């Protein structure tokens, strides 16, 4: 509960595979770079065919073209586009993103690699996070304690339009899903979701991370 400060967790500090949830700290780091004038949302970025990554998202379906940095961020967030995430990592640098993660005092989160082709099963280096760290990211956005409040709210608003709402939001009635900002993550045996919920009862964060689930249906319904 972001207003009262009450929290409950189970294994909330266990470092686990982040999957697509890693795109949340990547986006925060990008917005911080824009705030610090190290990047500009209107910068044009060309995405070439050999840079495209199979998996979630849509950029890999298009011919080579230019995108603004803002467009890449939005596509990365609302469609969990892997190619967009990799271009942003290239622009910011993995070291800078991890420095921003440390600046937010997130002790169990680390970007270890770019996103990979989802057809590859032998990737043994993973990006890591914890349920507590993901909830803390929402708290930073809500309170304006890393980004300014305007930019924090902008990111919350973008994630409200996130198109993959088939995990935690599956259990919420359709007319309330507009009150949820979320970032999902999944890969073989992993089903993750982190949410910011805002309604008349208050402002809440809710995160579930899972590993070694036998299949995606089991991971979603349990």
Question: Which role does the model predict for each range below?
Answer:
Residues 1-12, 43, 197-198:
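A short, well-structured edge-of-sheet supersecondary motif
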Residues 1-2, 49, 77-80, 113-114, ...:
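Active-site-proximal beta-strand/loop segments in catalytic clefts of secreted hydrolases
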Residues 5, 16-45, 206:
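Active-site SXXK
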Residues 7, 91-95, 136-168, 172-179, ...:
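Structured C-terminal helix/loop/strand segments within mature extracytoplasmic catalytic/sensor domains
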Residues 32-51, 99, 148-152:
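Short, well-structured active-site flanking segments
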Residues 41-57, 92-93, 158:
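Acidic helix-start/capping segments at beta-turn-to-alpha-helix junctions
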Residues 52-88, 124-127:
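Conserved catalytic neighborhood of penicillin-recognizing serine enzymes
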Residues 86-143:
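Mid-domain, small-residue-enriched loop/turn segments at the edges of structured enzyme/sensor domains
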